Amino acid sequence: MTQLPYAVDAETPLNPAELNVLRAQYEKEGEMVGVQTKFNYAWGLVKSNVRADQHLGVMLLSEIFRTSPERRRECLYYLALGNYKLGNYAQARKYNDALLENEPANLQAANLRALIDDKVTKEGLMGVAIISGVAVAAGVIGGVLLRNLGRKR
């Protein structure tokens, strides 16, 4: 991966002790969890390298985004980052573009856009290669079958 100035944030998880502090606070508050505590825990989860953590982080951020309009701006980048890390590039781009629409000079979001675009391009090329390979294989198999049918007659 090309290291962009803010890309380190996308790839640097909290250490387990730091994440455990956030988890403990979240669990301690229980049903009455505060928005800031929930956001902090979601932030730590999104930064994780564990897919289940990332998924939970995106879910918590989505809840904050829906229920706390005053916190939406804060959620946009981490929703974009979480979806990027989960491979949901269309969702990642949607959240990131919403942030860039309001903050066109946001370097973090601009760098995340570059990461998203790079992944989409690479996966698009991979998809084309896979489809091409399947088409070639189908053509070879079809040719062999037709040749064998011709010999039987």
Curated annotation (Swiss-Prot):
TPR repeats lie at residues 73-106. SUPFAM superfamilies: TPR-like. Residues 146-153 are mitochondrial intermembrane. It is a single-pass membrane protein. InterPro entries: Fis1, Fis1_cytosol, Fis1_TPR_C, Fis1_TPR_N, TPR-like_helical_dom_sf. Keywords: Membrane, Mitochondrion, Mitochondrion outer membrane, Repeat, TPR repeat, Transmembrane, Transmembrane helix. Residues 1-124 are cytoplasmic. Pfam families: Fis1_TPR_C (PF14853), Fis1_TPR_N (PF14852). The C-terminus is required for mitochondrial localization, while the N-terminus is necessary for mitochondrial fission. Has a role in mitochondrial fission. Has a role in outer membrane fission but not matrix separation. This is Mitochondrial fission 1 protein.
